[in-house]
Curated annotation (Swiss-Prot):
CDD domains: TOPRIM_recR (cd01025)
Zinc fingers (C4-type), renumbered ranges: 60-75
GO biological process: DNA recombination; DNA repair
Gene3D superfamilies, alphabetized: 3.40.1360.10, 6.10.250.240, RecR Domain 1
InterPro entries named among the record's database cross-references: DNA_Rcmb_RecR, Rcmb_RecR, Rcmb_RecR_Znf, TOPRIM_dom, TOPRIM_RecR
Family the entry assigns: Belongs to the RecR family.
Alphabetically ordered keywords of this record: DNA damage, DNA recombination, DNA repair, Metal-binding, Zinc, Zinc-finger
Molecular function per GO: DNA binding; zinc ion binding
The organism's taxonomic lineage, starting at the top: Bacteria, Pseudomonadati, Pseudomonadota, Alphaproteobacteria, Hyphomicrobiales
Protein's UniProt name: Recombination protein RecR
Function: May play a role in DNA repair. It seems to be involved in an RecBC-independent recombinational process of DNA repair. It may act with RecF and RecO.
Regions crossing the membrane: none
Signal peptide bounds: none
Classification via PROSITE patterns: RECR, TOPRIM
């Protein structure tokens, strides 16, 4: 059994960092050590930024984006075409599409995809909010930009079925987004091309 070589505070930091997606125990130890070595330049400012984020971050009640204001900056941006809504699984997908810079539209974050095997149904996602937004009127196009996974495609078909009979054009990202691929991992050029070549469902 390995002996503990640090105090409980450092161990706690390592354990919490290891819960961050993309960081395992080994990477978390390296990150913690780097932060501690750069205590004044990194650890202190990071601690302050995390405290501020904890106090100020909100989930937009309209679209599900993460921001410090509600409604969020995207929803209140008068320069955006609010008649076009891009539907994404997660906030990271919204950020990825914004980096691509191909469209200046509104967004709607579902908070995941339908997955009966994992017990995730329509009521567990922000689908009702989307239907309500479209029901308010003024939406001419819905771009379904979910990942090209089985769950993503199931979600896209479910949304399309729910919107039958409404006067809104429903499109999806063009093929080219690889099957099984996730938007957050694609380069900006691929995302921009996929948005431009979207097709009607």
């Amino acid at each position: 059994m390995a002996k503990r070589v640090t105090g409980p505070e450092i161990e706690k930091l390592i354990q919490l960092l290891a819960k961050v997606p993309g960081l395992g125990p080994r990477s978390a130890r390296r990150a913690a050590l780097h932060l501690i070595k750069k205590k004044d330049q990194l650890l202190g400012p990071l601690s302050n930024a995390m405290g501020e984020a904890y106090d100020k971050v909100k989930i937009c009640s309209r679209c599900g984006n993460v921001d410090t204001v509600d409604p969020c900056t995207v929803c209140t941006d008068a320069q955006r075409d609010q008649s076009v809504i891009i539907v994404v699984e997660d906030v990271s997908d919204l950020w990825a599409l914004e980096r691509a810079g191909a469209m200046n539209a509104a967004y709607h974050v579902l908070g995941g995809t339908l997955s009966p095997l994992d017990g995730i149904g329509p009521d567990d996602l922000n689908i009702r909010g989307l239907i309500d937004r479209i029901g308010e009127g003024g939406i001419r196009e819905l771009i379904i930009a979910v990942n090209a996974t089985v769950e993503g495609q199931t979600t896209a078909h479910y949304i399309t079925d729910q919107l039958q009979g409404l006067d809104v054009k429903i499109t999806r990202l063009a093929h080219g987004v690889p099957v099984g691929g996730e938007l957050d991992y694609l380069d900006e050029g691929t995302l921009a091309a996929a948005l431009r070549a979207r097709t009607v469902i």
